[in-house]
Design a protein with these regions (language model features):
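Hydrophobic/aromatic-enriched cytosolic interaction surfaces used to assemble or bind macromolecules
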Residues: 1-260
Length: 260
């Protein structure tokens, strides 16, 4: 009998590590495991890895428990990314030339070397522009080195707020966008956008909506409480016990679900 591949969402937060493993069973996703791993204070500060050895130690024993057939989608802090929209050049470019043009244009706008950037982009044909998400190469390299040292099968590195977009089709009207929060920040997502705001910028969901210029009546919070969106409801087959602080796994769940 073939063993299903574990699809793992891994969200490294400032106060701990949250992970979940799903398998695809015919037309639905099934929960295999979830983990909450402690993280030494000061290891992650404002989304940046300050103590890589502490992070490696925190993940080492966990990594050895994973089956050989696994693939990991790893969260990257939205606060360490930059989103830009670049008007397309008048001349149609081939794929390689287009990639180089985006790299050079982005580097010029940021006043950085193209070699210091990692980026992904999509072509918005309606607006005749490229939507670009960029991060510092050193930040991405640190995660790639971590995964390599732990023999993790890394599938993707995705901005944490972007992972919340996986839940948008599951919202019940009039809800059209959602937010997640921890002690220091808000992450938010709509069908076409995502981002991060510091908690001092908004104390409540209504204040966040006002700051973003989004309709508060169409908002919901990733939360198991009545009126919120429970991210665990996106998994078709669950198995007890589930964590009491379930909202902390929202990003990890979105990553593990992917496009399934």
């Amino acid at each position: 009998m073939a063993i299903s591949r574990w699809r793992i969402g891994l969200h490294i937060q400032q106060d701990g590590i949250y992970a979940i493993a799903l398998t695809q069973e015919k037309s639905y996703s099934a929960l295999r495991r979830w983990w909450q791993l402690p993280l030494e204070a000061g290891t992650i500060i404002d989304g940046q890895i300050r103590q890589p050895e502490h992070l490696r130690t925190a993940l080492q024993a966990w990594s050895k428990t994973l089956p050989r057939r696994h693939q990991i989608s790893l969260a990257f802090p939205a606060g360490r990314t930059l989103q830009k929209r670049l008007a397309r050049p008048a001349v149609r470019l081939g794929e390689s030339a287009q990639l180089q043009w985006v790299a050079n244009s982005l580097a010029r706008e940021l006043g950085m070397s193209a070699d210091d950037l990692r980026f992904d982009y999509t072509d918005d044909s309606v607006q005749r522009a490229y939507s670009v998400t960029a991060a510092q190469n050193s930040d991405i390299a640190a995660l790639l080195t971590l995964a390599d040292n732990l023999s993790l099968h890394l599938l993707a590195i995705t901005p944490d707020a972007c992972a919340l977009q996986r839940f948008i089709p599951l919202l019940t009207p009039p809800q059209r966008w959602l937010a997640w929060r921890d002690a220091t920040q808000w992450l938010w997502a709509t069908r076409n956008g995502w981002g991060r705001r510091a908690r001092e910028d908004a104390n409540t969901l209504d204040e966040l909506a006002q700051a973003l210029g989004l309709p508060p009546a169409e908002a919901t919070l990733c939360d198991a409480e009545p009126g919120g969106f429970d991210p665990w409801s996106a998994i078709a087959r669950l198995s007890a016990p589930l964590p009491k602080n379930g909202a902390a796994w929202a990003v990890a769940i979105g990553l593990a679900l992917g496009d399934a």
